[in-house]
Regions:
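Non-catalytic signal-transmission and effector/linker regions of two-component phosphorelay proteins
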Residues: 1-11, 16-37, 41-46, 50, ...
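Conserved phosphotransfer cores of two-component systems
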Residues: 56-61, 85-92, 113
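Active-site residues of response regulator receiver
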Residues: 68-69, 99
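The feature encodes the CheY-like receiver
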Residues: 73, 103
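A short, hydrophobic beta-strand element within the central beta-sheet of small alpha/beta folds
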Residues: 92-102
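Short, glycine/charged-rich "phosphate-handling" switch motifs in NTP-dependent
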Residues: 116
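A Lys-centered signature of the CheY-like receiver
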Residues: 121
Length: 148
């Protein structure tokens, strides 16, 4: 992610510590050196992205890429997706859903709420690691808009 103005920050919302380490390690292996800001629950992530008042003004001017697990301990990833995509300050931030759920209705719901990419976590370690490396290569060439 080669940006002239501000570097893109990757916000990773993933409650499984093993998955979070695997995701970060393989994004790094793909040559992506952007800051990764990890959260293990939706409440802390939304507080960071939307602020304590929920207005989202705290994200204004930032370039954010969000990696979102759907199965979190305190709320669903769908709730987070809906809040971020309906907020004027975060609606343009790309959201990549990374989850174990491969239910076609759930996939459709995520796209309906504005997910940009939906990736099913493979049970097989090597397959999942390879998918994340490929995602990292995608990150290295994509453009991310600045939040309003």
């Amino acid at each position: 992610m080669d940006q002239q103005a501000k570097p893109v920050s990757i916000v990773m919302i993933e409650d499984d510590e093993g998955h979070a380490r695997l995701i970060e390690k393989n994004i790094r292996r793909a040559g992506v050196n952007n800051e990764i800001i990890p959260f293990s629950n939706g409440t802390a992530a939304l507080n960071y992205l939307l602020g304590a008042d929920g207005s989202g003004i705290v994200s204004s001017g930032k370039q954010l890429l969000i990696l979102l697990d759907l199965n979190l301990p305190d709320m669903t990833g769908i709730d987070i997706l809906e809040k971020l995509k309906s907020n004027v300050h975060t609606k343009r931030s790309p959201i990549v859903v990374l989850t174990t759920t491969d239910d076609s209705r759930e996939i459709q719901r995520c796209y309906d709420f504005g997910a940009n990419v939906y990736i099913t976590k493979l049970v097989n370690y090597e397959g999942f690691a390879n998918a994340i490396r490929q995602l990292g290569l995608f990150f290295s060439v994509m453009q991310v808009p600045e939040a309003q």
